[in-house]
Amino acid sequence: MTRIRRGYIARRRRTKIRLFASSFRGARSRLTRTIIQQKIRSLVSSHRDRDRKKIDFRRLWITRINAVIRGNRVSYSYSRLIHNLYKRQLLLNRKILAQIAILNRNCLYMISNEIRS
């Protein structure tokens, strides 16, 4: 009886997985089981870090706004600024406020003085 060659399905699946891991180093780009483990781990990390990125940027914006507001030598804090913004119904989010704080501090000082009075 002649020998039957294996099909292409498993090879195609492994090739697809190897293409995903082609930029990895060492066994993580060569051994199929290790590639599969690393692929799962990398997808988990990317999913987790997409949420983490939003948290990190929000913290950065808050820190920048707070630093500029407190650097004005006025007894005024970030929480009071945000509270007054909401009270006055000004639609400035933290990202925009942080950009204003870095690029044009005088504008932020004007905004804070306007909403305080």
Curated annotation (Swiss-Prot):
Entry-linked InterPro entries: Ribosomal_bL20, RIBOSOMAL_L20_CS, Ribosomal_protein_bL20_C
Subcellular location: Plastid, Chloroplast
SUPFAM superfamilies for this protein: Ribosomal protein L20
Name of a matching Pfam family: Ribosomal_L20
CC terms in the record's Gene Ontology section: chloroplast; ribonucleoprotein complex; ribosome
Span of the signal peptide: none
Keyword Ribonucleoprotein in annotation: yes
Main subcellular location: plastid
Biological-process GO terms, alphabetical: ribosomal large subunit assembly; translation
GO molecular function: rRNA binding; structural constituent of ribosome
Keywords of this entry: Chloroplast, Plastid, Ribonucleoprotein, Ribosomal protein, RNA-binding, rRNA-binding
Superkingdom classification of source: Eukaryota
Family designation: Belongs to the bacterial ribosomal protein bL20 family.
Protein role: Binds directly to 23S ribosomal RNA and is necessary for the in vitro assembly process of the 50S ribosomal subunit. It is not involved in the protein synthesizing functions of that subunit.
PANTHER family in the cross-refs: 39S RIBOSOMAL PROTEIN L20
Name of the molecule in the record: Large ribosomal subunit protein bL20c
